Amino acid sequence: PPGTGKTTLAKVIANTTSSRFCQINATVAGKKDMEDIVKEAKDALGMYGKKTILFVDEIHRFNKSQQDYLLPFVEDGTVTLIGATTENPYFEVNNALLSRSRIFELKPLEKQDIRELVLRAVYDEKKGMGAYGADITEDAADFLADVANGDARAALNAVELGILTTKQSEDGKVHITLPVAAECIQTRAVRYDKDGDNHYDTVSAFI
């Protein structure tokens, strides 16, 4: 499912194994992108002994030849492949890659988990947006956790939108109330894009 931390988990694995981390999205990446990554991975391994983790999001969007291209480099250790898909991998990923892989199914996050992330995003000054001096009502936090449907990114995007697009009250704070939360997760995202490039996706790093 979306928003369950697939990308972040891959980054954690790369960090804990002291590996280089490369990320591509199969919906837009072509063979040239993969060739460049393989070359860089070979150089890093040969010159510095540094392994490379290649994270391919939406790997089911690669066709058979694209998946086959990666196979020899997975086999010889040039790259460690982590693929993410919202589809059934047994139908969408080549058997040759599957036979060399372990499959982990990530479940949608529980409502309480998302609620905790929402509160952390609002109040944590180091890892969240606590420096903005915002607060969120209990019913708003519950609402976001409920309608996110297991997708933490959706809830966190709404939090960021609420903080950045809601006017401060007389007390100098931004109050994320239930109406604000409902508007942010449904319609305000369409109107707000700070740099024309999905600015509000940044808070998804919490996942």
For the regions a language model picked out, list residue spans one by one.
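Walker A/P-loop
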Residues: 1-24, 39-42, 71-72, 76
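Short glycine-rich substrate-engagement loop in P-loop NTPases that contacts/grips substrate
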Residues: 21-53, 63-64
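Conserved AAA+ ATPase "SRH/arginine-finger" region at the nucleotide-binding site
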Residues: 25-27, 102-115
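Conserved AAA+ ATPase "sensor/coupling" helix adjacent to the nucleotide-binding pocket
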Residues: 38, 100, 116-130
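Short conserved motifs of the RecA-like P-loop NTPase core
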Residues: 51, 129-147, 179-181, 202
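Conserved catalytic/switch belt of AAA+ P-loop NTPases
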Residues: 56, 60-89, 95-99
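C-terminal helical "lid" of AAA+/P-loop NTPase domains
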Residues: 142-147, 153-168, 203-207
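Conserved C-terminal helix/linker of AAA+ ATPases
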Residues: 159, 165-188
